[in-house]
């Protein structure tokens, strides 16, 4: 039910097509949107192209961010849902480079980006655990970098992850 609700809300509120493998956890939208709004607020406190800052009211914050020419973000560990790049682009027209180490997540994220014709705005990059996080990935200026801790569906999955990292 949560998967269906997320799919319907993304379509209704953001015009996004979305689907992902059943084997992955479904992201809650409210917390993700709040995180992106917080990043937008932080960006608004930085000098704009005109050297001004803005730090009051959500409308002014949005205006401050839109004064920046292009906002580029990196989502480390984007997951199968690619939710932050999708919402960040929909809400603020940000461009994203999204990375992950899981091939199923990469394939799912690429499919979602393609379904929404966002290849010019969201780039999906596969990494390996051995590679440095950002080396060779960042090719132009980056305004922010974001990540979340891994999400697990059960205590057993947490235990398995701990064992595999040793």
Sequence positions of predicted segments:
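S-adenosylmethionine
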Residues: 92-94, 101-166
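N-terminal auxiliary segments of SAM/dcSAM-dependent transferases
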Residues: 1-28
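Phosphate/ATP-binding catalytic cores across multiple sugar-kinase/actin-like superfamilies
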Residues: 37-42
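N-terminal pre-P-loop "Q-motif" helix
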Residues: 31-35
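Conserved class I S-adenosyl-L-methionine
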Residues: 53-80, 95-97
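Conserved SAM-dependent methyltransferase scaffold
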Residues: 82-85
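Caspase-like (clan CD) cysteine peptidase catalytic core
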Residues: 88
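Charge-biased, low-complexity intrinsically disordered regions
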Residues: 4, 25, 43, 61-63, ...
